[in-house]
């Protein structure tokens, strides 16, 4: 499953990922994002990226929906599923 997405609690093919028209990010553009690079299957500076994501979300009064530890685990699971040792992980919270 090379190109994958994690949407609403599930991993699946990127081509099948959809966002509800009722999503606030879709309707009003509210959202934050982070891009995390991986090297040899390891996310680079993951704690710093997740801390910045959390700060950015708090500034917009958005919940990131998971703890940093949970996001770290999800990111590592996504890497395992994708089978890409070198990747860019794009996290978008709306």
Predicted segments, located by residue:
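Conserved alpha/beta cores of soluble small-molecule-handling proteins
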Residues: 1-94
